[in-house]
Amino acid sequence: EHLKVMQQNGVEAMLPGIESWYELGNKSKTSHIAGEEKLNRISEHVNMMFNYIPYVQTNFVLGLDSDAGSEPFELTKRFVDKVPAAFPGYSLLSAFGEAAPLNLQYQRENRVLAFPFSFLNNHLAMNIKPKNYEWLDFYDKVIDLTSYTFSKRAMYRRFMATKHSST
């Protein structure tokens, strides 16, 4: 019903935060599910959104403490396949302030890197050491996911799955 109202009011884009397959679902009805079940539920919902909203960018945070191994990256690739019209946006875990409770925890764990604030860009670099990855392994997985997401095949599928407007 909310989507119908948004469509009637001319909403052209939505940028929902999926964030993670394992945590940060408390903003939606997915707080009690994770992994494959969350992938399936969210994929179905985002595909349905395209009946009302022409552009949906889905946002993910990579490198959260709940992420370990290849699974979070592989689930995200499967999301790209299951919801080809969605434009995925990837952010790397970064702390932009010093007083947030989570940042204080990272500081206690000596995981915050000394990085000038003016150079922070959570799309290219992060200032929090990943809990469950070595740097090279983490960035190899990020590069692999990005290459998959923006491959010719994926971009073609995204283009073909998107309703095109003449305006």
Positions of PLM-derived features:
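A structural motif corresponding to the C-terminal lobe/cap of the Radical SAM core domain
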Residues: E1-S166
